[in-house]
Amino acid sequence: VVREGVEFSVLSRAVAVGGQLLTIQGIHDTYDEIFLPLHGRHQAANAAAALVAVEAFFGDQPLDIDAVRAGFAAVTSPGRCEVVHRDPTVILDAAHNPHGAKALADTLLNEFNFDEIIAVVGVFGDKDATGIFQELEPIVDHVIVTQSSSSRAMPSSELMKIASSVFGSDRVFEVSDLNSALDKAVAD
């Protein structure tokens, strides 16, 4: 058993263009200047856990630093704080519970410098929409509620009521069609 913060940890983390630069203390060595093309403190912790798993798999020797750097530089996580457009910046995140929404909010607050944040939100009916909105409320200026074509999608009218109870009705808009909601967000 290895424990984060005891046998391994993220020693340093700096925001970098397109991700973050890490130094990770593994079980067998310290790995520095690791570029991770993902955003968020939680992604750095995930990277450290992955590194330690690979170290454990290969036994009692340090990993080749060049292989570690190349491996992490090639990492992708589609739909997780993924920058899909610039000017205006559009970030796609598939947070589907309050914990994921908190990680998104922390990342947006600490790693980006936006003057205004407009969130386009659609939620499945079996998810904690109130909890998701409560985590986003401190950092989001306006919310556009929508729904996907999935049969599991919460109707946008229901989501509108929930969002309005958290944000206030003056900060929430309903656009039931997802593509139209995205168009509205980038036009505003």
What positions do the PLM features span?
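General small-molecule cofactor/ligand-binding pocket signal
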Residues: 1-4, 82, 91, 173-175
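Extended acidic/charged loop-beta regions that coordinate divalent cations
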Residues: 1-31
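Short, surface-exposed acidic
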Residues: 2-4, 63-68, 171-172
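Short beta-strands and strand-loop turn motifs
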Residues: 4, 114, 144-147
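Short, acidic/turn-prone active-site loops that include or flank metal/cofactor-
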Residues: 6-8, 122, 147-152
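Residues that form or immediately flank small-molecule/cofactor binding pockets and catalytic motifs
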Residues: 6-8, 77, 86, 177-179
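C-terminal helical cap/extension that packs against the catalytic core
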Residues: 17-22, 89-92, 98, 133-188
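Nucleotide phosphate-binding/pyrophosphate-handling subdomain across enzymes
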Residues: 20-142
